[in-house]
UniProtKB/Swiss-Prot annotation:
CDD domains: BTB_POZ_KCTD5. This is BTB/POZ domain-containing protein KCTD5. GO terms for biological process: proteasome-mediated ubiquitin-dependent protein catabolic process; protein homooligomerization. Residues 220-234 have a biased composition (Basic and acidic residues). Its interaction with CUL3 suggests that it may act as a substrate adapter in some E3 ligase complex. Does not affect the function of Kv channel Kv2.1/KCNB1, Kv1.2/KCNA2, Kv4.2/KCND2 and Kv3.4/KCNC4. Gene3D superfamilies: 3.30.70.2000, 6.10.140.750, Potassium Channel Kv1.1, Chain A. Residues 44-146 form the BTB domain. It comes from Bos taurus.
Length: 234
């Protein structure tokens, strides 16, 4: 006797199957679609197919913002061109990963964003669905994040390089990678057998490093390492 196997659909945070041990199969998903469309006590449920991932929620949740796309969807706005899939779910061609925070905001009024999601991505979805209160909330969060980043104190690193007069011009002209010339100090001259005296200098250079709020500053580039190595030989 042949067994019937279900083809599972992937679950999404906040979507169908979340907290139920995995995704729903296509047959079960279609069955829930019929329940969502059946008149009576279950008619308050609405199914959404967002980028291939199914979400189940209530009309009350989707109608939190009367000016939003989702409100118009629930009201069957004739000016809104919306299709349904074979299970009766509304088709929305958007990223399901970023729809989770949007739907949860409509559910409980709080903005919760996982660490692996960017605020800008949530803002894009909030603007698409035209949820004005969420748009303002995400923009405030982005401004707060950027403000903290701009207030990170600067760290100045200084290096002292020793060079001869003939090397001085080339060293200063080729200096890059954020290093700036600060001071030049003459330390006399050196004598090499068979050659003329060479004036020697100490060249002081500096660089500004931003201390990252999430960890140490980035590794110096190759040119910076060369300057550091030359300074360490003093």
């Amino acid at each position: 006797m042949a067994e019937n196997h279900c083809e599972l659909l992937p679950p999404a945070p906040g979507g169908l199957g979340a907290g139920l041990g995995g995704g729903l199969c296509r047959r079960c998903s279609a069955g829930l679609g019929a329940l969502a469309q059946r008149p009576g006590s279950v008619s308050k449920w609405v199914r959404l197919n967002v980028g291939g991932t199914y979400f189940l929620t209530t009309r009350q949740t989707l109608c939190r913002d009367p000016k939003s796309f989702l409100y118009r969807l629930c009201q069957a706005d004739p000016d809104l061109d919306s299709d349904k899939d074979e299970t009766g779910a509304y088709l929305i061609d958007r990223d399901p990963t970023y729809f989770g925070p949007v739907l949860n905001y409509l559910r409980h009024g709080k903005l919760v964003i996982n660490k692996d999601l960017a605020e800008e991505g949530v803002l894009e979805e909030a603007e698409f669905y035209n949820i004005t209160s969420l748009i303002k909330l995400v923009k405030d969060k982005i401004r707060e994040r950027d403000s903290k980043t701009s207030q990170v104190p600067l760290k100045h690193v200084y290096r002292v390089l020793q060079c001869q007069e003939e090397e001085l011009t080339q060293m200063v002209s080729t200096m890059s990678d954020g290093w700036k010339f600060e001071q030049l100090v003459s330390i006399g001259s050196s004598y090499n057998y068979g050659s003329e005296d060479q004036a020697e200098f100490l060249c002081v250079v500096s660089k500004e490093l931003h201390n990252s709020p999430h960890g140490p500053a980035s590794e110096p580039s190759e040119k910076a390492k060369i300057l550091q190595e030359r300074g360490s030989r003093m």
